[in-house]
Swiss-Prot record:
Disruption phenotype: Disruption results in severely reduced transformation frequency, but has no detectable effect on either the frequency or the location of division septa. Disulfide bonds: none annotated. It comes from Bacillus subtilis (strain 168). It is found in: Cytoplasm. One of its GO terms (cellular component) is cytoplasm. Keywords: Competence, Cytoplasm. Required for post-transcription initiation control of the comE operon. Promotes the accumulation of its target comE mRNA to septal and polar sites. The gene is comN. Its main location: cytoplasm. Interacts directly with DivIVA. InterPro entries: Post-transcriptional_regulator. It comes from the Bacteria. This is Post-transcriptional regulator ComN. One of its GO terms (biological process) is establishment of competence for transformation.
Amino acid sequence: MEKHPADLYKDHVRPFLYSKLEEFKILGYDDVELESLWSYLTDKKWKKKTELSIYELASDILSVKIGEFMNYATVESFKTSNWLGSEEGQEALEELLR
């Protein structure tokens, strides 16, 4: 996996990441992990940015909405899921096509 320019500052913004994870827990999303939040930020929020300052990173982290993150997480889970390739998935597909 290619390193993102923001990875240099990950340790500096870690308190902001933990703060956002705590906010998600208060909203009932206990299973969000730091790495998945970081992946969302580097893959979506900062995808095309090559130069970032720490205050921009902190602001972007604190402005993440749970809906935006969950949309990203859902799409990523579909991308990595091989359910249709499984026997159970094939049976369900055949049942739908009858």
